[in-house]
A protein has these predicted regions:
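Mobile amphipathic helical/loop "lid" adjacent to a hydrophobic cofactor/ligand pocket
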Residues: 59-60, 64, 69-171, 183-185
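Conserved flavin/dinucleotide-binding core of flavoenzymes
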Residues: 303-430
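Short beta-strand to alpha-helix junction loop
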Residues: 50-57, 132-138, 147, 182-204, ...
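N-terminal Rossmann-like FAD-binding beta1-loop-alpha1 element of flavoenzymes
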Residues: 1-24
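Helical element adjacent to the flavin cofactor pocket in flavoenzyme catalytic cores
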Residues: 176-230, 234-238
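Mid-domain catalytic core of redox enzymes
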Residues: 18, 216-332, 350, 389
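Glycine-rich FAD pyrophosphate-binding loop
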Residues: 16-40
Length: 430
């Protein structure tokens, strides 16, 4: 198993439960991939994936298996649209109408479109991209306009996709928007007490994981599979490779189908965790745990407040400012102090009352650069995944990871589960 992110660890755990001996090789000194929790300013802060959803299927099942508790964050959320922050409650969908985000006339006008979406999404899941293959060639903007959801998309779906996945949803495949929306508009947001890393740590503690092991190349040979590393050659009946798509060409010779899925572009993320000298007041940032930004509303993709996830222990707080796309790329090359200053300015545009609340110590804030944050889903991407999965039936080296998944963690975990099933079939093959 090459790669110890959520996809690789899920695959390894699935195989281990089936009685297969698995060794996990991880290049970095840390396991977990996008699950990365850190201590900062008296808070537990997520320096990668920030939340889970009650609509997820694989990750909550893993948490239950491993006795890792889940807890709901504040139900207060917000969307920034047209220069205004609209607060609402995820457990009360009508609150989006009362807030002005979805005016009553707009909401009523979108009902036929919602009925069309419900009918067309019936029987489709949120884990497997191929459930939505028929929408692969159409852009989200064309699709939402065609089914009569243009205004709902503009005011809620596009800000949500941008805030969650650091991408302009108008140009992605209609399939991606449909799958995200199929999670449900009122799903509760979840976290793990002590941070999301508790789950990947729990998985790793039950597996043979070798961190700090760089895989130079993996190949099929006459005896099975050989992984050439800086600490020797590992031989096995089969291998799963769950690394970011841009890393795949360096570690293996790719078939045409593997090359196609590895060509996926990734969104760029820049997380700036700003330490605050006090907890945020209830009316600041609309009282929301997270604020999701429309792609036309400035450089930020989202804001997230640690105390409203139950992650603040002392009197301070942390507000995470998430930059995406060209803004993330432009800022990432600067010094951390410059990036922190830029994040403070961006935050004050939305909440000027925080101008005197920043913790002054440099160590109270942190900058996290994520050059390959999440896979994008342009029209046509799912056809490449479909072609790869058909070809993978005959391979001893199987891909997993987010190159085969939607940009959310539950789908990456499901890709690991799928890869484990393919490897099990290889091992059991006469």
């Amino acid at each position: 198993m090459i790669g110890a992110g959520i996809s690789g660890l899920t695959a390894a755990w699935q195989l281990r439960k089936a009685g297969v001996r698995v060794t996990v090789l991880e290049r970095s000194d840390r396991i977990g991939g996008r699950f990365h929790s850190i201590e900062l300013n008296g808070c537990r802060v997520e320096a990668g994936a920030n939340f889970l959803s009650a609509a997820y299927r694989v990750v909550p099942f893993l948490a239950g298996e491993l006795a890792v508790p889940l807890q709901a964050v504040s139900a207060k959320s917000a969307i920034a649209y047209g220069g205004e922050i609209y607060g609402f409650r995820t457990d009360r969908p009508t609150s989006a109408v009362r807030s002005g985000l979805l005016p009553i006339g707009t909401s009523l006008g979108q009902l036929p479109g919602l009925l069309r979406f419900t009918a067309r999404s019936r029987g489709r899941g949120t884990l497997d991209p191929l459930d939505w293959l028929d929408l692969d060639r159409m852009t989200a903007e064309d699709w939402t306009r065609g089914i009569g959801l243009a205004q709902l998309a503009e005011r809620s779906i596009y800000p949500a996709f941008h805030g969650f996945y650091f991408q302009d949803a108008r140009t992605v495949s209609a399939a991606a928007i449909g799958a995200m929306a199929a999670h449900g508009f009122s799903s509760r947001t979840l976290t793990i007490p002590g941070g999301l890393s508790r789950l990947t740590d729990a998985l790793a503690s039950r597996l043979d994981v070798r961190t700090g092991t760089t895989v130079a190349f993996v190949e099929e040979d006459a005896f099975g599979v050989a992984a050439h590393t800086d600490s020797g050659v590992f031989r096995a009946e089969a291998a799963i490779v769950a690394v970011p798509a841009p890393d795949l060409p360096a570690v293996m010779d790719l078939t045409a189908q593997e090359e196609a899925v590895s060509a996926v572009a990734y969104s760029t993320g820049l997380l700036v965790c700003l330490g605050m000298a006090r907890r945020l007041h209830e009316d600041e940032l609309a009282g929301a745990y997270g604020v999701l930004m429309h792609p036309d509303d400035g450089p930020l993709a989202a804001l997230c407040v640690a105390s409203r996830a139950g992650h603040a222990r002392g009197r301070g707080d942390v507000v995470t400012c998430m930059f995406a796309g060209k803004d993330a790329r432009a800022l990432s090359g600067g010094a951390d102090s410059e990036i922190v200053d830029a994040a403070r300015r961006a935050l004050l545009v939305w909440e000027p009352r925080l101008s005197g609340a920043f913790a002054p110590a440099p160590e109270a804030s942190a900058v996290v650069r994520i050059p390959h944050a999440m896979p994008t889903t342009p029209p046509g991407r799912l056809a490449a995944i479909d072609a790869y999965r058909e070809r993978a039936q005959t391979r001893r080296i199987v891909l997993a990871g987010d190159c085969l998944a939607w940009p959310w963690s539950d789908s990456a975990a499901a890709a690991g589960r799928w890869a484990a099933g393919r490897v099990q079939a290889v091992i059991d093959r006469p």
